[in-house]
Amino acid sequence: MRLIILCLAALVLLIQFPLWLGKGGWLRVWDLDQQVIAAQKKNDELRARNAKLNSEVQDLKEGTGAVEERARYELGMIKENEIFVQVLDPNKKSSFVSIPPPKIEPKEKR
């Protein structure tokens, strides 16, 4: 009787091995599920990015508002009869190096 129980236990273990550790086992399925979740998350991020880019393209094609905004912020352009005011942070050091103008020596009289 003991021999039969041991044989049955061994058979159960042999049957369970491919279920858990085999090519199509539960561990592999779990790993693939994690990969699918990561891919879906990345796809959602890319869809959001594409939607944002598509709306920007539509704005540039149809209206002048987006073009005007880009001209203002990226190129520093202003409209006619507009006053440009720039507020600087007093605590932030300027990244520009000021160079004094060159000295001009007076011409000699002849």
From Swiss-Prot:
Keyword flag Translocase: no
Annotated TM spans: 4-21
Q: Which Pfam families match?
A: DivIC (PF04977)
One GO process term, biological-process aspect: FtsZ-dependent cytokinesis
GTP-binding in keyword set: no
Q: Keyword annotations for this protein?
A: Cell cycle, Cell division, Cell inner membrane, Cell membrane, Coiled coil, Membrane, Transmembrane, Transmembrane helix
Give the Cytoplasmic compartment stretches of this protein. Answer: 1-3
Please give the GO cellular component terms listed in this UniProt entry. Answer: cell division site; cell septum; plasma membrane
Q: Which residues lie on this side of the membrane: Periplasmic?
A: 22-110
Chief localization? membrane
Q: How does it sit in the membrane?
A: Single-pass type II membrane protein
Name its cellular compartments. Cell inner membrane
Q: Which residues form a coiled coil?
A: 31-64
Matching entries from InterPro entries are given as:
Cell_div_FtsB, FtsL/DivIC
What is this protein for, i.e. what is its function? Essential cell division protein. May link together the upstream cell division proteins, which are predominantly cytoplasmic, with the downstream cell division proteins, which are predominantly periplasmic.
According to the record's subunit comment, the protein's assembly and interactions are: Part of a complex composed of FtsB, FtsL and FtsQ.
What's the name of the protein?
Cell division protein FtsB
